[in-house]
Each structure stands twice: as structure tokens, then as C-alpha cells.
């Protein structure tokens, strides 16, 4: 979807990335996931949060890549980092030691209590239903797995999530909890030795959701320009609730769009050159 905001044209994907970038503030330490989180975190670094410290799972600290990495092992991350440490040090000292302000994650599937699934799709959720022909042992789709996301969700002081909005991704109950949000009933973190408070915001291409302070169920707090309540309801696999005071997300600025598009153009050019080399 493309939106026209006076003279600015932008896509729903650009809206999502820029909104996610705005959630990051200056002088915070962010443990970044690959994909959409990395895109948003680097846009933040290149715009309003130049002093944000980006950390990747491979052990790169305060990295400032000129192009987006394809994986946590991308050489661009090491070349532009202040320093690198071992993976055990990254997890045991930095993450488990409570030094990470924000964990920035993506996912294949998310439920109403912000639990994430990147392990298996064991049912067909496209129409909001379940297909019993599939299971964990015989999944419809087997996904890459959790990587460092379970540890990030447990130990980062708070977690940001960014994911495209559809009934396939936003399901009432995830097929498998790879990364805990608030558990199956919203109380799953209460008896766990968590350092962090869990997910604080979910940014999609349609809206912003935040956990209810009491129930921990995700609630829509802001609609992106051009998005209606009906759009969100139609794309969500449960009876989603809306905040009494519903905001409209500010549209991307010309500067934000320029930075994002230049970053993606540099990335495409660099990776294309690698493929032909």
C-alpha cells in the first residue's frame, strides 16, 4: 500500500520501519535482530538517535554499518564496530548482566500476549482457524528457530517487536512459544527470573500495539495514516481491543524517507556487487 501525505509518497513498509525507528531513543543500548529490526535501528542511528549503541548477536559492539547486514556474521558489522567480543561474553556479560536497554526483534508469528514463534507453523491461520493435520513433529512450515531471541526477551530491559500485520502472523495463540512475551495467560513472566519487563511495543505496517498494563493483552494504541479500525480487525486473528484514546501515528518526514531509501539503495548495490564478484 502506498500513502500520499500531501506531497510525500511512502509505502506501508516504509511507514512501519520509520515508526519502529522512532521508538529508539538516543543514548540507549540496543540488541538488534536481523531483518526489519536492523533496518529500523539503523534508520534511528542515522536520524534522531546518533548516540544509540547497536549490538548484534555475533559480538559486535557500537557497530555503524554503512549497509544493512544479511546476517549476524556479516563482515560489515565487524568492520564498522567499536570492538568485538566473543558470543559467550555477549550473552553472559552484556545481556544477562543487564546492560541491554532494548531488545529489537522480528517474528514469524505473534499472539495476543506478545509471545513469538520462529520455530514451526503447525496450523493454517490464514482464515483464523486451525488445521489439525499439522503438528510440531509434522509442521506446515519449519522455521529457522529462536537464535538469541529467547535470551534477549528474558534479559533486555524491554523488548520492541516489528512485524507485518496479517492473520497469518497475528494469531490468538502461537503454535510454539519460541520467545516468551507474557505467556499463554498474560502471567507467564511472573515466576521467571527475568531481568526485563518484556515487550513494551509492537509496530506493524498498520498500527502500534502495546500491552494492557493489567492483562498484558496487546491493544492498539495508534493507527497509521490511512488505516482504519476495520483494517486492523480484519488482519488480526483475535478480537483485538483499541485504546479509548486512539492516536494517529505521525507520517514519515522527508528526511526519514530519504535516509531509509538511501540506506536500502546502498545495501542493494553492495550486495549485488558481492553476488557478481
Cite the ranges covered by each PLM segment.
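Polar low-complexity intrinsically disordered regions
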Residues: 1-5, 126-131, 276-277
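N-terminal active-site beta-alpha-beta segment that forms phosphate/nucleotide-binding
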Residues: 2-82
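Short, surface-exposed, charge-dense and proline/glycine-enriched linear segments
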Residues: 59-67, 84-88, 271-277
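Alpha-helix capping and helix-coil boundary motifs
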Residues: 11-12, 86, 223, 228, ...
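Acidic/aromatic/glycine-rich contiguous surface patches that form carbohydrate-binding/processing clefts
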Residues: 245-277
